[in-house]
């Protein structure tokens, strides 16, 4: 499921004890976006790739792969087996159609962009147990009539 470069990046990140939040401060990009570069779902600029590889102590020759547009959405199998990723699949199974209806009531017939899009993860402290807050913000794209 992970490429050789993903494994190298994750291994170097662990060895250096660097967090995605720290890389966010270094690169000036969101931590989720940086993680998506690690998993080859986003493309870094040459400058971003150089900063990232330098911070991780990796060979700058790897920059070429990080700056090449990747094949996106290549998770396998179709139904994820990782428990955390599966929860998002499960959320869409339960709330996908209701979410679609609410979005279309507010915006009309269309979709939320995953290209003009941001994804943020926050920790919300709660006495009953900390909570994960995921915020998706995508441009609404109305279906064209012709």
Swiss-Prot record:
GO terms for biological process: cyanate metabolic process. SUPFAM superfamilies: Cyanase C-terminal domain (SSF55234), lambda repressor-like DNA-binding domains (SSF47413). The keyword Glycoprotein does not apply. CDD domains: Cyanase_C (cd00559), HTH_XRE (cd00093). Disulfide bonds: none annotated. It is an enzyme of class 4 (lyase). GO terms for molecular function: cyanate hydratase activity; DNA binding. The keyword Zinc-finger does not apply. It catalyses: cyanate + hydrogencarbonate + 3 H(+) = NH4(+) + 2 CO2. The active site is at residues 87, 90, 113. SMART domains: Cyanate_lyase. Its EC number is 4.2.1.104. Keywords: Lyase. It comes from the Bacteria. It holds the Pfam family Cyanate_lyase. Catalyzes the reaction of cyanate with bicarbonate to produce ammonia and carbon dioxide. Belongs to the cyanase family. This is Cyanate hydratase. It comes from Synechococcus elongatus (strain ATCC 33912 / PCC 7942 / FACHB-805) (Anacystis nidulans R2).
């Amino acid at each position: 499921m992970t490429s050789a470069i993903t494994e190298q990046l994750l291994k170097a990140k662990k060895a250096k004890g660097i967090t995605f939040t720290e890389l966010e401060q270094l690169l000036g990009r969101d931590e989720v976006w940086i993680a998506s570069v690690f998993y080859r779902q986003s493309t870094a600029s040459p400058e971003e790739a150089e900063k990232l590889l330098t911070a991780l102590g990796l060979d700058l020759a790897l920059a070429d792969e990080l700056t090449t547009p990747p094949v996106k959405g290549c998770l396998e199998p179709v139904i994820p087996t990782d428990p955390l990723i599966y929860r998002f699949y499960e959320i869409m199974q339960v709330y996908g159609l209701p979410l679609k209806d609410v979005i279309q009531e507010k915006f009309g017939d269309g979709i939320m962009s995953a290209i003009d899009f941001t994804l943020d993860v926050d920790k919300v402290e709660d006495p009953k147990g900390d909570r994960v807050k995921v915020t998706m913000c995508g441009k609404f794209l109305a279906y064209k009539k012709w």
